[in-house]
Amino acid sequence: MDSMVDQQSQQPLEGQDRDARGGNEVNARSGEFTFNCPSTTDLRATDGLPLGANSQAQSAARSASSAEHASSATSSFIQVEDWDDSASLTDSVQTFPEEFGRTYHAYRAGSYLFPNDNTEQERLGIMGECYKMIMKGKLYLAPLSTRRPPKNILDIATGIGDWAIQMGDIFPNATIIGTDLSPIQPNDVPPNVYFYVEDSTSGCWSDFETQIAQQAFNALEPGGWFESQETDCIPLCDDDTLDPQGPVATWCNDLIAAADKLERPAIFGEKLKEIYERVGFVDVHQRIIKMPINGWAKDSRLKQVGWMWADHMLDGLSGFSYQLLNKAFERTSAQIETMLSAANSLIGVSN
């Protein structure tokens, strides 16, 4: 999820461009294997930037996907302030199509291949808590000031809206905007938090540098901050005990290959720092943080995070896999379940 924080402008960040979450790398282990997960990249806009149509002064951005250009994004917004009374939130947006026993977003169906049902919402909640714990209680790493707090914050691909809601509590005088394809955010939110149904994936797959990074740069005023946090899905191992031909590595490699075939690349976190610098951002900081999976870590905090991340992975196995593997390789449900069963037995193992 991406977020942009405007510290001077009084206008909401409607239609603001989004970037990918970058900055922390997390490792997940079953036995002694790990995944590179959340990666955070902080970026500051240079002085003398041209102001975009929806330019913001001091901004920090966070996302789980990417953003489309501000001009097109504004026209596609469906505001979600009151689920019961909002005339703009049509029944078609809330009637989620079902496939493989899971539900998916209805607005611009097919833009995003992961589900949005209760299991997925639970996974997103666990993921958010893991990110926060691995970052030692922080929601962001950009140097935002509570003495000179931001005026506007944009959270792109907000999911269940937990990050946006917490930011609304931290910065009560800021306007917090969260966008997502699915209206699955709660009703009870701080008065300064607003959610919109919007497609941030438009344009992000074909050319991230020009369609996302450059537009995000143009949308920020001098001094603006953008933060992206990415989860890498390549399994790593500290003690070389991970079988490169085993079920976990095979599952991950198949997902990466499927994503590439469908032109939705899963691996680009390692390229973000160079891309952001190339489009003009300065003070670009990349932080890589290891995320354990299950209970192998000796440190009590990391052990707790590891078990939570294992739950997150187990909740996500089918959601990550069905659309990608079926659409890319025409695999049947039975074939996918056989693969997931083998990976499941390793991800949840204890040391």
Residue ranges, per PLM feature:
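Conserved catalytic/acceptor-binding region of the Class I
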Residues: 225-319
